[in-house]
Curated annotation (Swiss-Prot):
Record protein name field: Muscarinic acetylcholine receptor M3
One GO cellular component term noted in the UniProt record for this chain: plasma membrane
Protein's gene: CHRM3
A Pfam family: 7tm_1
Organism: Gorilla gorilla gorilla
Region ranges (Disordered): 323-357
Record topology, Cytoplasmic segments: 92-104, 165-184, 253-491, 547-590
Cited function: The muscarinic acetylcholine receptor mediates various cellular responses, including inhibition of adenylate cyclase, breakdown of phosphoinositides and modulation of potassium channels through the action of G proteins. Primary transducing effect is Pi turnover.
Cysteines joined through disulfide linkages: C141-C221, C517-C520
Subunit structure: Homodimer; the dimers can form tetramers. Interacts with NALCN. Interacts with TMEM147.
Motif (Basolateral sorting signal): 275-281
UniProt entry keywords in alphabetical sequence: Cell membrane, Disulfide bond, Endoplasmic reticulum, G-protein coupled receptor, Glycoprotein, Membrane, Phosphoprotein, Postsynaptic cell membrane, Receptor, Synapse, Transducer, Transmembrane, Transmembrane helix
Transmembrane domains' residue ranges: 68-91, 105-130, 143-164, 185-206, 230-252, 492-514, 527-546
CDD domains per record: 7tmA_mAChR_M3 (cd15299)
GO MF term list: acetylcholine binding; G protein-coupled acetylcholine receptor activity; G protein-coupled receptor activity
């Protein structure tokens, strides 16, 4: 904020015209008569006298006792609420791990600046108003002004950082989110404070040494180099009008981008419903299935294998490692594979926090099918017709034998709507007699025999369809949750910006008016406008609580001293989960 001073007739705002200070003697009134100084009653009772420098020695600054009580009570309450509110923010960040997000680090920095204003600036300014003069000396004056301006400018810089962070998080999720770490946030916060300190502290503390003398009169406290209204207005432009303009533009862009993502999410949900009703057809026109003609043909050629793997469905974003199942050397070398490409494809579609929703993200699942002697990943394959399916009944029987071993487990995973585990336990089945039969059987099958393979393909397609629908719903849910989080962060930002604009605008408007008319604004209005800037530090914690449920519940927990209870409940919950895990572990091993 910009404390405006350019004259010597007023202790706080020296630029105010002397026409607002009416002396009783000038008006022809007796010395005991009460008059008005701005909106304050100034008593000229006996015992009040002026010192040689023109300042009064009255400790009440010419105010009545009731006026002093009212001012002290009101400003004291505001300072106390500011201190408690911002301490709650800092402690909440410390005790609640859910609040330790990158965005909340910026709010923590803002709370620290507001706490400094509540502890130091508000109380010293109240003393200045009540006494109507500065009685703490030049060094204390310069230190107060330096701390006040650095903390206030740091608040503005933190708001700018929050606005840019929200803007880049919304508009550049792929590139910015990868760089958005707590370390980088700490660097940005440090830069905000360093810039604020460099801009104000040296000039406030050492300007009198730069120019060779101190021009601030005794009993007054203001920044020496802000002695001209034009300079004061220039600092107001740089410290308020320009940041507000930038933050408003950024918030408008954030709002438009959020609306765009909301529409795209609605389109994704609609496409999911359409795909479900149209037999799960990919937007490009290709149908998704977990079986293919090429896979069936290759399975026929490998019917002489000694051991057969089961049909596995994989849904993971990590590299798949082959099982330790013993295989022939030639098949081990030819069938080994890595699904990094599949994982990357799935990751691109599943990580809703890291990308925009586009047409390329409609391919929402990849299914890995491991059949006898073959491991591959299938994408955009068409369901084979009955004419093209030629699989020996012997091989079909061997596959069916092993499918029965996992029928209950796989069926339960699909029917219950649960996701498939990352890996199924390997249950190799020795089928020596079946293999001998397969060696002597004829590879070619008639069309009538090929129809027997249709139930297998349709079963696989049904499992794939259910699995893919579950995957689509999970991805859509993640995108929806991400959008909700972005909206909440935008709401918090909007509340903070609105409070900042409302509380800082009146004072800066008066600075603008004073540039053209230095006698148009009473001293009382200057005091109120300057105090209103301080009230912004009081309102900010309220904005956090209103817009963030986690902050709200943590505030309530701290105010009601429920930290110990919550910790005990958390420990009890963890103990129960540990018992459940140990009970389930032996069952899963069977």
């Amino acid at each position: 904020m910009t404390l405006h001073n350019n004259s010597t007739t007023s202790p706080l705002f020296p630029n105010i015209s002397s026409s607002w200070i009416h002396s009783p003697s000038d008006a022809g009134l007796p010395p005991g008569t009460d008059t008005h100084f701005g909106s304050y009653n100034v008593s000229r009772a006996a015992g009040n006298f002026s010192s040689p420098d023109g300042t009064t020695d009255d400790p009440l600054g010419g105010h009545t006792v009731w006026q002093v009580v009212f001012i002290a009570f009101l400003t004291g309450i505001l300072a106390l609420v500011t201190i408690i509110g911002n301490i709650l923010v800092i402690v909440s960040f410390k005790v609640n791990k859910q609040l330790k997000t990158v965005n909340n680090y910026f709010l923590l920095s803002l709370a620290c600046a507001d706490l400094i204003i509540g502890v130091i600036s508000m109380n010293l300014f109240t003393t200045y108003i009540i006494m109507n003069r500065w009685a703490l000396g030049n060094l204390a004056c310069d230190l107060w002004l330096a701390i006040d301006y650095v903390a206030s400018n740091a608040s503005v810089m933190n708001l700018l950082v929050i606005s840019f962070d929200r803007y880049f998080s919304i508009t550049r999720p792929l590139t910015y989110r990868a760089k958005r770490t707590t370390k980088r946030a700490g660097v940005m916060i440090g830069l905000a404070w360093v810039i604020s300190f460099v801009l104000w502290a040296p000039a406030i503390l050492f300007w009198q040494y730069f120019v060779g003398k101190r021009t601030v009169p005794p009993g007054e406290c203001f920044i020496q180099f802000l002695s001209e209204p034009t300079i004061t207005f220039g600092t107001a432009i740089a410290a308020f009008y320009m940041p507000v303009t930038i933050m408003t533009i950024l918030y408008w862009r954030i709002y438009k981008e959020t609306e765009k993502r909301t529409k795209e999410l609605a389109g994704l949900q609609a496409s999911g419903t359409e795909a479900e009703t149209e037999n799960f057809v990919h937007p490009t026109g290709s149908s998704r299935s977990c079986s293919s003609y090429e896979l069936q043909q290759q399975s026929m050629k490998r019917s002489n294998r000694r051991k057969y793997g089961r049909c596995h469905f994989w849904f993971t974003t990590k590299s798949w490692k082959p099982s330790s199942e013993q295989m022939d050397q030639d098949h081990s070398s030819s069938d080994s594979w890595n699904n990094n490409d599949a994982a990357a494809s799935l990751e691109n579609s599943a990580s809703s926090d890291e990308e925009d929703i586009g047409s390329e993200t409609r391919a929402i699942y990849s299914i890995v099918l491991k059949l006898p002697g073959h491991s591959t990943i299938l994408n955009s394959t068409k369901l084979p017709s009955s004419d093209n399916l030629q699989v020996p009944e012997e091989e079909l029987g061997m596959v069916d034998l092993e499918r029965k071993a996992d029928k209950l487990q796989a069926q339960k995973s699909v029917d219950d709507g649960g996701s498939f585990p990352k890996s199924f336990s390997k249950l190799p089945i020795q089928l020596e007699s079946a293999v001998d039969t397969a060696k002597t059987s004829d590879v070619n099958s008639s069309v009538g025999k090929s129809t027997a393979t249709l139930p297998l393909s349709f079963k696989e397609a049904t499992l794939a369809k259910r699995f893919a629908l579950k995957t689509r719903s999970q991805i859509t849910k993640r995108k929806r949750m991400s959008l909700v989080k972005e909206k909440k962060a935008a709401q918090t930002l909007s509340a903070i910006l609105l409070a900042f604009i409302i509380t800082w605008t009146p004072y800066n408007i008066m600075v603008l008016v004073n540039t053209f008319c230095d006698s148009c604004i009473p001293k009382t209005f200057w005091n109120l406008g300057y105090w209103l800037c301080y009230i912004n530090s009081t309102v900010n914690p309220v904005c956090y609580a209103l817009c963030n449920k986690t902050f709200r519940t943590t505030f309530k927990m701290l105010l009601l001293c429920q930290c110990g209870k919550k910790k005990r409940r958390k420990q009890q919950y963890q103990q129960r989960q540990s018992v459940i895990f140990h009970k389930r572990a032996p069952e899963q091993a069977l």
